[in-house]
Amino acid sequence: MRPVVTSSAPKASTPPPARPGGDGYGGEGSSGRSESTGSARLGTRGPRPGGGVVVKRMARGADDGYHSQLVPGLKSSLDAVRLINELVYAAERLKLLAADPPGLWGEVAGSGPLEERLWLAFLIALIGPSSGEDELDDPFSAIEAVRVPWGSTPDLDPVVPGPRAGFDPRRWSQTVAAYCGWASKAGSQEQGFKGEPAWTPERRFDRLYERLGSLPGMSRDARFELLSVLGTLGVFEIKVGRLHLAGENETTVAGKRVFGIGDTLLLDRRAMALAEICELPLVALDLGLHNWGTGVRVGGGVPIDLELDPDAIERCRRALKV
């Protein structure tokens, strides 16, 4: 079943209990997909005439007096339930990536030549897998159609970017050329990602996130996905130590709504506190906030109907008092 969302928040004032794997709205199924009554699709992004990014977001739930110090920006218990489901889904996605990565992510984690695997990981993060709503569709098909060996230049003109694509379609050639130049300067992609021997896994993430941010058109989402998945797959010792919530992107906008503040430092602190108390990996908040904010679940190459851990759901409900 495809998720259907609407720009209108649910009208109920009291949330139904979040069943393990349920959608938090009391609907059928075990996928954790968000549903409502309309059919208007939210959370899509497209290039503005000026080349910027349009950020659309789910309307707020009705204020029913809900309050939690962990998520002070939320005034609706329905919003809190929906957030729980998306955070737990994102955590389940990480488990699958670590244990049995699907599709092209499995190739990145495989035993082929490392330079080819890193190049493929870059293309996946840059182009972005499709949403995965249709179980018959291969979320990596657009990437597979344009992938070329390392050292060759792909033609991304015909590509329809995924929902978390990391490039401006009009500047993709600049982004690819800049990435290749970055790798060449380092000596190889491998050396570029390894960085300095003294780096801790968290330091490696932060420094690479900063360096890749100098590439034209390389968005926050693409950088975060590339580095976090390389760490999850065990390709390099890379670990997320903070969410880097800044700029105009769905994850940051959602974080500001959830945590009720715009200061970057405080956003990261509140995100870490939420992850710690809910016993979730901090990196799960990246995709979890994105999906909560847009109201449309995307899996980044992973099925969107993963069964949600009932114990994780219950921990989060206790933590958020909902």
Where are these regions (language model features)?
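Alpha-helical ds-nucleic-acid-binding substructure associated with the helix-hairpin-helix region
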Residues: 133-214
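Phosphate-/polyanion-interacting regions in eukaryotic proteins
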Residues: 80-83, 89-159
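Generic structural signal for hydrophobic core residues of well-folded globular domains
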Residues: 124-129, 212-215, 230-231, 255-259
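Low-acidity, Ser/Thr- and Arg-rich intrinsically disordered low-complexity segments
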Residues: 2, 6-8, 12-15, 36
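C-terminal accessory module of base-excision DNA glycosylases/AP lyases that mediates lesion recognition
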Residues: 32-106, 181-207, 221-322
